[in-house]
């Protein structure tokens, strides 16, 4: 495929851009006067100018040297019917014909099987060896010189036209695309003709070709000055569509062309297409034109008198001859491994493409055949090298295709003895560095600390509650409770914190700090905010019912007895 980095013009342009940057730096005073860089920078544009002049002179020389000669034509002699068919009792159906060059007319016997063909134009070619066929009910139209497509070109062998082709681009290369049996046959092509002028064919390269009957094509690299001399322009290869109106061109010379119109039809195999355009001898390789471009190339007849066959040019250029790995999606064709071909229910055709290799073509699939033709696992046992023979319990390798005289794995490897310690070795004084221990808090230690903290807090609260109860009993003016105490969900420690002296509160805070510093931090918990739903509403209702029951309970009027004080137990949450 064409790559811009490999073109000499691209490299020269890049060098001139660099030199232009250097010259700009020189103009702005970026280099010293004695430096050699400005000289090299001026030499590059000068060499580029010489190269362009030499290239233009070479092109002019080749253009002038290419000779444009008048197209050679065959002086065809034919006879024209002068009378209607008539019946002769002895000879059958007869007709009178007169020669085209003038002279006396002759009487010709008409074959009875041809009588039905006399009412219209010629339907089927008379040459039995021809691969072309007209289509019943179709007619040929004359084409004025200059009205044919600009990409169409005739292929000549002496004065005879042996086929047609078109100029197009395949994998980035400008080339001639035609049928292989036109370019490589006994009648060697000698010239390309366009609008009555022809250019002699030289030893042009054919990098890609296939001689299979169903996939008949060749790619010829024609020099650009030849295309320019003939006035042939490139065309585009497009994907064919079903029931697409198409036209084929052909004739005895490039300035005496006929055209036939028909309909293009796609078949199960994507590399093939059929059309109903009438053709004649010498039309092989002619492009099949649609309103969008070239959809295929005519190669022969499919059903004589009804359908003709062509090669899908878009499939060939974009799937078989494409150097890129990415395939276009227009035809939905995929490449499969070679071993998957046998798993398909239909038959693949095997083709060999010069310049690409062998391939298997299916309906919407194709596979490239490995160079050996099969994988190593498919080799027959006879093709494998003979194994060694066993004689008297020993393996004889003389008859085997091996490079050793003894087996690689005998009984076992020889035993190895450890080396004695070296006497000159001395002990080193280096000490092993101790790794710093990471602080950790085991679960049992944490549990014991929490238990001791709770017991300490509980004892202090019991002592303070007893002191408060004793002082309240000794007080004469202390009124009783005016109302029943309400149940509170506040922790016990928070309620009685005001009752604890300041000295005890400091001790408790120090204990809490010591316990929390030895406790590892808890994992963060992500709080998810839920939207109110049926479950949350039912939870709120049940909470309201519980609060109503608590409010309707009978309040306790009696004060706690000093003889039986109720110790208050608090948890770590209240600290």
Curated annotation (Swiss-Prot):
The polyprotein is proteolytically cleaved into several chains by the viral protease. The keyword Transmembrane helix applies. Residues 513-575 are annotated as: Disordered. Coiled coil: none annotated. Residues 558-575 have a biased composition (Polar residues). Pfam families: Peptidase_S39. Residues 135-335 form the Peptidase S39 domain. The active site is at residues 181, 216, 284. Residues 541-553 have a biased composition (Basic residues). GO terms for biological process: proteolysis; viral translational frameshifting. The chain crosses the membrane at residues 10-30, 36-56, 74-96. InterPro entries: Peptidase_S1_PA, Peptidase_S1_PA_chymotrypsin, Peptidase_S39B_luteovirus. The record marks 132-133, 325-326, 402-403, 497-498 as: Cleavage. The keyword Cell inner membrane does not apply. One of its GO terms (molecular function) is serine-type endopeptidase activity. Its EC number is 3.4.21.-. GO terms for cellular component: host cell membrane; membrane. It is an enzyme of class 3 (hydrolase). This is Polyprotein P2A. It comes from Southern bean mosaic virus (isolate Bean/United States/Arkansas). The lineage of its organism: Viruses, Riboviria, Orthornavirae, Pisuviricota, Pisoniviricetes.
């Amino acid at each position: 495929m064409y790559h811009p980095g490999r073109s000499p013009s691209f490299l020269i342009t890049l060098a001139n851009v660099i030199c232009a940057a250097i010259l700009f730096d020189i103009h702005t005073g970026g280099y010293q006067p004695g430096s050699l860089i400005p000289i090299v920078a001026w030499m590059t544009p000068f060499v580029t100018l010489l190269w362009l002049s030499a290239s233009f002179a070479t092109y002019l020389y080749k253009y002038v040297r290419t000779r444009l000669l008048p197209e050679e034509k065959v002086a065809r002699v034919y006879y024209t019917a002068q009378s209607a068919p008539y019946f002769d009792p002895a000879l059958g159906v007869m007709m009178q014909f007169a020669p085209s060059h003038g002279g006396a007319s002759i009487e010709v016997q008409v074959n009875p099987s041809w009588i039905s063909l006399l009412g219209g134009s010629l339907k089927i070619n008379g040459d039995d060896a021809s691969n072309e066929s007209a289509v019943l009910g179709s007619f040929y139209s004359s084409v004025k010189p200059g009205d044919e497509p600009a990409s169409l070109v005739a292929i000549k062998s002496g004065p005879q036209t042996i086929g047609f082709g078109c100029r197009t681009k395949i994998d980035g290369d400008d080339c001639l695309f035609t049928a292989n049996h036109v370019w490589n046959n006994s009648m060697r092509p000698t010239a390309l003709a366009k609008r009555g002028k022809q250019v002699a064919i030289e030893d042009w390269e054919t990098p890609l070709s296939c001689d299979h009957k169903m996939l008949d094509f060749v790619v010829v690299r024609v020099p650009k000055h030849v295309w320019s001399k003939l006035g042939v322009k490139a065309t585009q290869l497009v994907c064919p569509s079903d029931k697409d109106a198409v036209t084929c061109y052909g004739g005895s010379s490039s300035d005496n062309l006929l055209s036939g119109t028909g309909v293009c039809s796609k078949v199960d195999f994507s590399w093939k297409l059929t059309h109903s355009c009438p053709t004649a001898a010498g039309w092989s390789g002619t492009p099949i034109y649609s309103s969008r471009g070239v959809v295929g190339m005519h190669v022969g007849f499919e059903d004589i008198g009804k359908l003709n066959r062509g090669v899908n040019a878009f499939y060939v250029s974009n799937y078989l001859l494409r150097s890129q790995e990415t395939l276009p999606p227009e035809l939905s064709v995929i490449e499969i491994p070679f071993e998957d071909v046998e798993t398909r229910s239909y038959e693949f055709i095997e083709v060999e493409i010069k310049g690409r290799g062998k391939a298997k073509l299916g309906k919407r699939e194709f596979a490239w055949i490995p160079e050996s033709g099969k994988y190593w696992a498919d080799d027959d046992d006879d093709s494998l090298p003979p194994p060694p023979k066993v004689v008297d319990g020993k393996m004889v390798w003389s008859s085997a295709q091996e490079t050793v005289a003894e087996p690689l794995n005998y009984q076992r490897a020889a035993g190895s003895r450890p080396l004695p310690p070296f006497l000159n070795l001395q002990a080193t004084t280096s000490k092993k560095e101790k790794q710093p221990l990471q602080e950790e808090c085991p679960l049992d230690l944490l549990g014991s600390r929490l238990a001791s903290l709770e017991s300490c807090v509980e004892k202090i609260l019991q002592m303070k509650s007893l002191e408060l109860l004793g002082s309240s009993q000794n007080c004469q003016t202390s009124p009783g409770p005016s109302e029943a105490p309400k149940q509170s969900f506040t922790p016990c420690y928070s309620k009685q914190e005001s009752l604890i002296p300041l000295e005890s509160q400091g001790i408790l805070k120090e204990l809490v700090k010591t316990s929390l510093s030895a406790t590892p931090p808890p994992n963060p918990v992500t709080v998810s905010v839920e939207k109110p739903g049926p479950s949350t509403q039912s939870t709120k209702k049940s909470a309201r019912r519980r609060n109503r029951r608590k409010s309707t309970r009978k309040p306790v009027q009696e004060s706690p007895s000093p003889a039986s004080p109720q110790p208050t137990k608090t948890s770590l949450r209240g600290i």
